[in-house]
Regions:
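Active-site and substrate-binding clefts of carbohydrate-active enzymes
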Residues: 37-48, 52-55, 67-70, 82-267
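Binuclear metal-dependent hydrolase catalytic cores centered on His/Asp/Glu-rich metal-binding motifs
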Residues: 61-75
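Short, small-residue-biased leader/transition segments that mark boundaries at the very start
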Residues: 2-7
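Glycine-rich, histidine-containing beta strand-loop boundary motifs that form or position
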Residues: 1, 23-27, 135
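Acidic, His- and aromatic-enriched active-site or binding-groove loops in soluble protein domains
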Residues: 11-36, 41-52
Length: 267
């Protein structure tokens, strides 16, 4: 699964890495009239199957379960399985995907979320509904059609795009400054630099900077506002860049860096 189910047409690359399938969002602007309850394949590579998240049924658990103002509150396992049982019989694959932080963070344990999950298997069995892993679905179901994803897509907000990460000037400034030292980081062999580089690329660093309104309570980690997140990130990033430049000064031009990269690859 891509982080936050971000995807764009890159089927050949993913298939070349040995993957047989990809989990992604069942966004309306990509599906059009199609249903997310079938297996599809990537338009670039028919060998790469796509499993599309049913965002309503997924978000009913991960986002709305403990919301006392929700029209379906409180949600019981029997009701949830009745919704799934009501899906047309020919639509045999219903993908429920969510982050683990939905259990205990977005939905506190006091909401009885774990008891709800424990009750699901028995309620499903009583209605003739079975569970499968993504690999089992990919192995046992044929693709019904190709699906083209020409624009970046995610499972976040109504737009289902990447504007939550790169939609404002702060996010783009931080992103561009981070990757301005990418070539230098690639050629370094300092394990702490490599580790911090991975940390700095975490998608939540940029998501915490979003100024978009959200249909659910936006989790910002330790920050009170997107501006606090931006300020703290840029301070840390500035220190990181100084460390990188201490190893590979800015006056090393791209041609020299490329020569170093080529030398490393050939070793």
């Amino acid at each position: 699964r891509q982080r936050q189910m971000c995807i764009r047409d890159r089927g050949n690359m993913v298939a070349s890495m040995g993957f047989k399938g990809l989990l992604t969002e069942g966004a309306k602007h990509i599906l059009g009239w199609k249903s997310p309850h079938f297996v599809y394949h990537c338009s670039q590579n028919p060998n790469l199957k796509l499993l599309l998240r049913d965002y309503k049924l997924s978000d009913d658990i991960s986002l709305r379960f403990s919301n006392s103002t929700w029209s379906e509150f409180p949600l019981f396992a029997e009701t949830y399985m009745d919704w799934i049982a009501a899906v047309p019989e020919e639509e045999q694959v219903i993908n429920i995907f969510m982050e683990l932080c939905a259990l205990g963070m977005f939905q506190p344990l006091s909401s009885n979320i774990l008891e709800f999950l424990k009750a699901l298997p028995a309620c499903a069995k009583a209605r003739g509904i079975s569970f499968s892993t993504p690999s089992e679905v990919i192995d046992h179901h044929k693709s019904v059609d190709a699906l083209e994803v020409p624009y970046p897509m995610s499972w976040v907000d109504e737009e289902r795009d990447i504007s939550c990460w790169l939609g404002n000037g702060m996010q783009r400034e931080a992103f561009n400054k981070l990757y301005s030292v990418a070539d230098r980081v690639r050629i370094c062999n300092d394990s702490r630099i490599k580790q911090d580089w991975d940390y700095l690329q975490a998608s939540n660093n940029f998501r915490f900077m979003t100024t978009k309104s959200s249909s659910w309570n936006m989790y910002r980690g330790i920050y009170d506002s997107p501006y606090d997140a931006f300020t703290n990130y840029m301070n840390i990033l500035g220190d990181f860049i100084n460390r990188v430049n201490g190893m590979y000064p800015r006056d090393i031009d791209n041609e020299e860096l490329n020569s170093l990269l080529t030398l490393i690859k050939n070793q």
